[in-house]
């Protein structure tokens, strides 16, 4: 299955393509990484459906999440949240603005029998982190894995402001002595 359907292909003068290269098959596939099972949606997931470049960062969650309350922002498939759950986190909340992502992450929690400790909710991280901070809500581990805020040089300054703002909001959510991870 080919996923060459990102906007930057047009900027580079390449056509966008998406579809089967072989006979059709179920595009929801199961993979295992760091002992965590995932159903990855190749056809409708963000970009390729799963971000393999974050494998080591997800594995690092196993060292810091045991016994902690964890917040995973921009959760997508729930990969950081699920690693926190497998590592023995007391509770994990993953949030994403996409209901499709929340549904996929919830399905992955069930696949790993983590649904009692690992929950997912639909929220805009920019909005909810400010709200929760004002309410005094905090977590032992806060993970931010936001999408790219820029695709061109013209918007780099805006992107820097966006990263600064979301990281400041995330840091305010960390309990004293806790951990803040941003990718």
Indicate where each model-derived feature is located.
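Non-catalytic substrate-recognition/targeting regions of SAM-dependent transferases
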Residues: 1-50
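Conserved alpha-helix/loop element of class I SAM-dependent methyltransferases that forms part
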Residues: 52-68
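Conserved SAM-binding motif I beta-strand of class I
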Residues: 91-96
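S-adenosyl-L-methionine
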Residues: 100-143
């Amino acid at each position: 299955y080919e996923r060459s359907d990102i906007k930057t292909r047009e900027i580079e003068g390449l056509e966008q393509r998406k579809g089967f290269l072989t006979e059709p098959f179920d595009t929801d596939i199961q993979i295992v990484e760091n002992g965590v099972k995932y159903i990855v949606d190749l056809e409708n997931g963000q970009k390729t459906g799963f971000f393999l470049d974050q494998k080591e960062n997800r594995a690092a969650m196993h060292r810091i999440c045991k016994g902690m309350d964890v917040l995973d922002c921009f959760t997508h498939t729930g990969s950081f949240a699920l690693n926190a759950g497998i590592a023995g986190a007391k509770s994990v909340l993953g949030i994403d603005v996409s209901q499709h992502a929340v549904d996929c992450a919830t399905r992955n929690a069930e696949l790993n029998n983590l649904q009692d400790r690992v929950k997912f909710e639909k929220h805009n991280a920019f909005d909810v982190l400010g709200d929760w901070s004002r309410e005094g809500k905090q977590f032992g581990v806060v993970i931010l894995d936001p999408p790219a805020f820029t695709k061109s040089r013209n918007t780099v300054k805006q992107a820097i402001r966006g990263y600064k703002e979301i990281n400041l909001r995330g840091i305010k959510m960390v309990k004293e002595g806790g951990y803040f991870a941003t990718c």
